[in-house]
Amino acid sequence: MAVSLSASARRRTAKLRRHVRVRKKVSGTPIRPRLVVTRSSRHIYAQVIDDVAGHTLASASTLEDGLRASDGDKSAKAREVGRLVAERARAAGIDAVVFDRGGRTYHGRIAALADAAREGGLNF
């Protein structure tokens, strides 16, 4: 007998499955750290992480004072976070990263952040 799930439970399960599938393949090294993108309904966060040492090398989010007060839609703020994290990673001597979309589909705010990080000089 099959158990039927609600629509939200199916989405949550699918996201978890995607996240596990991506994390099996993606790992950050000191030479090529992992750019992790985390998204909520209101904010977006980006961190550059060296998984070997377990350290965050650079980060940016919409919770920062300059971005929190800025006008614009959520995609514009995601682009600004991407630009900021690329700038901070480059200042830390990082040119190449592995992109970890955190189980989210590569669309909308996730894609906007990734494109802005590429324009900022990070190679994926």
From Swiss-Prot:
GO cellular component terms listed in the entry, alphabetical order: cytosolic large ribosomal subunit
Q: Which UniProt keywords apply?
A: Ribonucleoprotein, Ribosomal protein, RNA-binding, rRNA-binding
GO biological-process terms attached to the record:
translation
Q: Which domain of life is it from?
A: Bacteria
**An example molecular function term from Gene Ontology annotations:** structural constituent of ribosome
Which InterPro entries does this chain map to?
Ribosomal_uL18_bac-type, Ribosomal_uL18_bac/euk
List the coiled-coil residues: none
UniProt similarity note: Belongs to the universal ribosomal protein uL18 family.
Subunit note: Part of the 50S ribosomal subunit; part of the 5S rRNA/L5/L18/L25 subcomplex. Contacts the 5S and 23S rRNAs.
Task: Give the function comment from the record.
Answer: This is one of the proteins that bind and probably mediate the attachment of the 5S RNA into the large ribosomal subunit, where it forms part of the central protuberance.
- Name of the molecule in the record: Large ribosomal subunit protein uL18
* Highest classification ranks of the organism: Bacteria, Bacillati, Actinomycetota, Actinomycetes, Frankiales
- The gene name reads rplR
